[in-house]
From Swiss-Prot:
Nucleus recorded as keyword: yes
Protein name, as recorded: Ninja-family protein Os03g0419100
Positions with biased composition (Low complexity): 84-94
GO BP field: negative regulation of DNA-templated transcription; signal transduction
Species for this entry: Oryza sativa subsp. japonica
Disulfide partners: none
Length: 307
């Protein structure tokens, strides 16, 4: 019985049974039932009742898109409204974003202004340093003129000292040389303005400077000969070392200094570079006072240690 009622409700027979029981509507042929045909409607509502006498409040579907709007229950026209333009989403308010752009433009203007001021300052400094250069050039020309005057005075003195350098009319040759070509005179002025070379060794103030010795073939030959002399000297002064036994004994190297007949024997130690007698050399090695110090000294004739 329950299954028949259930099928009757969904099959359309429930309406006749309800009309027979007195629960139907006053108007015949019009039913107040909601259609459950699962048909999609505008606004996201299912089973919309299009009858004008349906006055029940229905829930409208909410939407996150502004262009989707629900159909009002009071309006019978199911056509949607005109879509609204999509708004731009922003994480910052409009006022804050405008303030940020305004601040950035102001910073850019300040930077451009500072850059322009620096450029103007550089140009002004460069223009102020330009007038000083002619003064320096004038000073250089004055020095050149003074050198030319000294040179002309010296040339006149030399021409007066040497009568053969004078012409038949008695005028000095240096006066005629002044009428040379401008290029030759300019070269002379440049040469006179240059400082004296190292070959003369005499600067303008008259003091003589000591020249640095040049390495020539003769100096190399002298160096080679001196090296050979050192080898000969080392052959004459052989290498010696101490031979001391005991807890305080140590080996000290030295060489036998060249001595002549009748002179005392002296040994120079390598560690301190001092001259000692044989007894002092053995004592320096930690042997103490010995009766025959020459027995504690070993002679090594090889001079390769010092070469």
């Amino acid at each position: 019985m329950a299954s028949r009622d259930f099928l009757g409700v969904f099959g359309g027979g429930g309406g006749e049974r309800r009309a027979a029981n007195g629960s139907g509507s006053a108007v015949g042929g019009e039913s107040d039932e909601i259609e459950l045909s699962l048909g999609l409607s505008l606004g996201g509502r299912f089973g919309t009742d299009m009858s004008p006498d349906a006055k029940r409040a229905r829930l409208a579907r909410s939407s996150s898109i502004a262009s989707v709007c629900s159909v009002s229950a009071a309006d019978g026209d199911p056509s949607p409204a005109a879509p609204l333009p999509l708004l731009r989403t922003s994480s910052l308010p409009t006022e804050t974003e405008e303030e940020r752009w305004r601040r950035r433009e102001m910073q850019n203007r300040r930077r451009l202004e500072a850059r322009r001021k620096r450029l103007e300052r550089r140009i002004s400094v460069g223009s102020s340093s330009v007038p000083n250069k002619p003064g320096r050039e004038d000073g250089g020309d004055g020095a050149v003129n003074r050198l030319q005057l000294r040179r002309s005075i010296g040339s006149q003195g030399s021409s007066s000292a040497n009568p053969q350098d004078q012409g038949p009319d008695g005028s000095a040759i240096c006066q005629s040389t002044e009428a040379r070509s401008p290029s030759t005179s300019d070269d002379t002025n440049q040469n006179s303005a240059l400082p004296p070379t190292a070959s003369t060794g005499k600067p303008l103030n008259g003091t003589v400077t000591q020249q640095s010795p040049l390495r020539t073939l003769g100096s190399l030959t002298m160096r080679t000969s001196s090296t050979g002399d050192i080898g000969k000297i080392m052959m004459d002064m052989p290498m010696v070392s101490s031979k001391v036994e005991g807890p305080n004994g140590r080996k000290i190297d030295g060489f036998l200094y060249k001595y002549r007949k009748g002179e005392d024997v002296s040994i120079m130690c390598v560690c301190h570079g001092k001259f000692h007698s044989p007894a002092e050399f053995v004592k320096h090695a930690g042997g103490g006072d010995v009766s025959n110090p020459l027995r504690h000294i070993v002679v090594n004739p090889s001079p390769s240690v010092f070469l």
